């Protein structure tokens, strides 16, 4: 299958998920993440879910991270060069939907990519070798390439490879 075919297949699978499916699967994913040996790190990058894309609901993980007093980092998308700017999430960080309905920080304290210890990666599709397919713009490919060598990457998906 081509990347486009895989992308379409998994977008369709997501469309078929009900709100209850998303909630139950997101809770199961959060419970799996809680069991991982990742909680000694400081900076955790998490994506804020795009509801219309039926992504894994990261609100649960966000609450876990905040409950463990971790430094939570979210990103702002630059659609001119397909890069991400990373912002520390605080109680005063304004978050709004951009024109593509992606929740993003409007401004705040910028965090350099090399400070990030753990990245929760949105997965549309993936394989057993760590290859992923996203929405096709390469935001996360560029971001992950610039992370430090020992960054912990945790892919979040409703579906197995």
Description of each model-found segment:
Residues 80-161:
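Conserved phosphate- and dinucleotide-binding cores of soluble alpha/beta proteins
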Residues 1-103, 109-114:
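N-terminal active-site beta-alpha-beta segment that forms phosphate/nucleotide-binding
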């Amino acid at each position: 299958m081509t990347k486009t075919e895989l992308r379409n297949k998994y977008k369709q699978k997501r469309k078929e998920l009900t709100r209850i499916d998303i909630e139950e699967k997101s809770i199961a994913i959060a419970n799996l993440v809680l069991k991982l040996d990742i909680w000694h790190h400081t900076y955790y990058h998490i994506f804020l879910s795009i509801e219309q894309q039926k992504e894994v609901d990261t609100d649960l993980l966000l609450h876990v991270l905040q409950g463990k007093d971790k430094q939570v980092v979210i990103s702002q998308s630059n659609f001119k060069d397909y890069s991400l700017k990373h912002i520390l999430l605080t109680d005063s960080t304004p978050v709004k939907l951009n024109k593509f309905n992606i929740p993003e920080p409007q401004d705040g304290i910028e965090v350099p990519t090399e400070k990030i210890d753990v990245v929760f990666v949105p997965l549309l599709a993936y394989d057993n070798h760590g290859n992923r397919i996203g929405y096709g713009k390469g935001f996360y490919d560029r971001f992950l390439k610039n992370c430090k060598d020992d960054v912990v990457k945790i892919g979040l998906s409703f579906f197995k490879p």
